[in-house]
Amino acid sequence: MTTNSGITKEWVDETVKPGDDFFRHVNGKWLATHEIPADRPKDGGLYTLRDNAEKHVRELVEKIAKEQPESRIGALYNSFMDVEKIEADGLEPLLKEIAPILNSATPSHLAVTLALLSRAGLPQLFAWYTSNDPKDPKNYTFFLYQSGLGLPDESYYREEKHEAACAAYVEHIARMFELTGLAEGFGLTPEQAAQLVFTHESELARLHWNVVENRDAEATYNPYQATELDEKFPGFPFSQWLLALGADPETLGQVIVAQPSFFEGAAKLFTSIPLMSWKLWAVWTVLRSRAPFMYDELVQESFNFYGKTLSGTQQIRERWKRGVGAVEKALGEEIGQEYVAVHFPPSHKEKMLVLVGNLLEAYRESIESLDWMTEATRQKALEKLSKFVTKIGYPDKWRDFSALELVPGDLFENLRRTGAFDADWLIARKGQPVDKSEWLMTPQTVNAYYMPPANEIVFPAAILQPPYFNPDADDAANYGNIGMIIGHEIGHGFDDQGSRYDGDGKLESWWTEEDYAKFKERTSALVEQYNAYVPVGLAPKFHVNGELTLGENIGDLAGMSIALKAYRLALKKQGIESLADAPVIDGMTGIQRFFFSNARGWCTKSRPQHAEVMISVDPHSPDEFRVNGVVRNIDEFYEAFGVSEGDALYLAPEERVRIW
């Protein structure tokens, strides 16, 4: 048995009681002294691993770019890094891209142009993708989703707390039109053009569903035949748009429209708003999307708004970092194949499989002992749990990029080609059987996910590193950290939305009405708790949205509770009968190390501007509440740190939420 605790206590702030603020007790000294690097809005936690992964990917990319400049990776990276050519090209690449917009003489012509721009990887009025059909999860289907905004979310256009951001956005649009001279072609000053674009986007924002509505798996599943979209949503030529996209509506068949009222309203606006306004807005969408890839003056202005104003970031990322990011976005699996060959030992996968096995066993035991669930629902829950698919490290089959040809020295052409390649790949999958080997993240991504229609949990190689996963450390540290993350992802299968899918990934209820009512009662209590939380340093109006974050909060609470049970199981398999008998290491009991390790994993610090954006749009709670909001609902936390009535985190036993 190891005596390596896997944790250190140098950041502990002894002036903060664990029962008042466990997050700051564990991390207080770091939070008080750490300076966020100038080129990012947030630091700590996962960012250390992301820095490591980025450094490793850079080494691979630059080696390939130097030795094989004609390769896809070499062509894309070198074209991004060729600053001299980009500066010399000036506005010319953008003018070529917007020429079809300016030449669109009719709404139908413009609709075709918007589709072609979408094929080039540019966001437009409607977003689209193909993925597992929630009602037929063995096959891919085609989804249509609301889009068209330049601010993070529709709430920015209507809520008073975002007025300053809106004013800055209008100024930014005007500045971009001033730098490019593009407003003149419309007979407008930059200021007039900016106001017209903002008014246009505000009209679209009024039609958008909000972030809570968009979480509803049933409400956003609305099937239509592709051939009937013109009739169902009159005003926009969907058939022509789909054809230009590369998807023939006659063969496309059924499509899923996520927000029908948005599509109905946007289609009406397409004919009621003057064509000139639509063309100006379309020019703006291309300009804001391509600006980060253009000459320095536009790059800096884009960063000044999206980086500095919205996120508080003080300095743009070094060019190599942005270049690596561009390669990752376009060719993630191709570089991922190189990454895992060097940076993922097979032993990590073996250890992870043991952890996952214990987490699944702990979930099974927990479900079997739930006192609020009837036997009928319990059996369905256990059936779903038994069908979970676990993917660790990297895909068994890699995506084939051989049909993609990129051009050395032409960044914009490479961006268009990668966009079209992705579009064709996605469209070709419609109606085909789901490729069960597919991953939605690359191996070098520091993250993890659960996919409801596949009922699978996925852990890329890059997250399987200290402090989250340390194969040489004591079990308490690993179960408190990566164990909780595993439990969190499994927990998504049983959160307020994931619980609507059965074991085969089908969006179909398996609950009795009585049990679902009891489940809702417990989750509603969690919503109330989180609605009351305001991150330190923000005004009360920036409180957590308990409805938006509910799924992640259920995942956090379930993940922590079940990881603790799994730690108990691991101890028993080593002949240790109880948590109390776990070894004391570095002056801490096993249960203390478990909670301590978890709090260290969430140790992050955000700039206020970034925190304000994320509180509005991110379905995850701020990291301080991913610690404090969870532990106060777990009885063992009270025992481990002597938390009692009067402490800030104290909840009476009957107020503690217990779900899974």
Regions found by a protein language model. Give the residues of each.
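Short secondary-structure subsegments characteristic of cysteine-rich extracellular domains
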Residues: 38-61, 187-207, 478-484, 586-587, ...
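Noncatalytic, helix-rich "gating/capping" subdomain that lines the substrate-entry/channel surface
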Residues: 61-354, 358
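Intrinsically disordered, low-complexity linker/terminal regions across diverse proteins
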Residues: 197, 203, 256, 260, ...
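Hydrophobic/aromatic-rich, well-ordered segments within soluble, folded domains that form packed cores
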Residues: 11-32, 157-178, 550, 557-562
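Active-site-surrounding "flap" and adjacent substrate/cofactor-binding loops of secreted or lumenal enzymes
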Residues: 3-4, 16-20, 25-88
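Short, Gly/Pro- and small/polar-rich lid/capping loops
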Residues: 1-10
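Extracellular/periplasmic catalytic domains that process cell-envelope and extracellular macromolecules
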Residues: 14-18, 134-136, 450-453, 587-589
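Short, solvent-exposed loop/turn and secondary-structure capping segments
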Residues: 33-37, 128-129, 153-155, 208-210, ...
